A protein has these predicted regions:
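RNA substrate-binding interface of SAM-dependent RNA methyltransferases
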Residues: 1-79, 140-141
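Residues that form or flank phosphate/diphosphate-binding pockets in enzymes
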Residues: 14-15, 83, 104, 126-127
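Gly/Ser/Thr-rich helix-start
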Residues: 18, 76, 100, 105, ...
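Short, glycine/charged-enriched secondary-structure capping and boundary segments
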Residues: 19-21, 46-48, 87-91, 110-113, ...
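Short, acidic/turn-prone active-site loops that include or flank metal/cofactor-
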Residues: 36-37, 59-60, 101-103, 121-125
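Active-site/ligand-binding-proximal alpha/beta "capping" segment
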Residues: 79-118
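Structured adenosyl-cofactor binding patch, chiefly the S-adenosyl-L-methionine
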Residues: 109-146
Length: 146
């Protein structure tokens, strides 16, 4: 059982730092970026890079070509038809893809995902690193209870 989590077209370096620290705390096997738009100056006072690797992919095709064998790409997007996280059954082998702070995941990325899930909220949407934390916490709770 393993999972990775990352952000497509991330533009805010702080969100990557928060994702990295949360990923370590929730047991992610790796994190990644797809077409990142920030300057690569990661500051990590907790040295998460020593325990959770970061992969950088040029674009969604590059990520898809490098998905581990028998692993599903799960998009996280508040869009019509997306499965509600509250009833979602996490897969044993999954890579979660979240979208940029300003636009969400691209249409091309959404079309390449095996599934799309959404986090219900009262209004608008969550910050991308907060959404990642919610997904990882939900995964930890549901899979540890099996």
């Amino acid at each position: 059982m393993y999972f990775g989590i990352g952000i497509e077209r991330c533009k805010n370096i702080e969100n990557m730092g928060l994702l990295w620290r949360s990923a370590e705390n929730f047991g992610a096997d790796f994190i990644f970026t797809v077409g990142a738009r920030y300057r690569k100056q990661l500051t990590d006072i907790y040295n998460s890079f020593q325990r959770v690797p970061l992969y950088n992919y040029r674009d969604i095709d590059d990520l898809y070509e490098h998905l581990p064998y028998s692993c599903r790409l799960i998009g996280v997007e508040n869009s019509p038809g997306a499965a509600d996280l509250r009833g979602y059954k996490h897969l044993q082998r999954a890579v979660y893809l979240l979208g940029a702070e300003d636009h969400g995941i691209t249409k091309k990325a959404a079309s390449m995902c095996h599934e799309i899930i959404k986090i219900p909220c009262e209004a608008g949407c969550f910050n991308v690193s907060v959404a990642a934390g919610i997904i990882m916490y939900d995964r930890m709770l549901k899979l540890s209870s099996n």
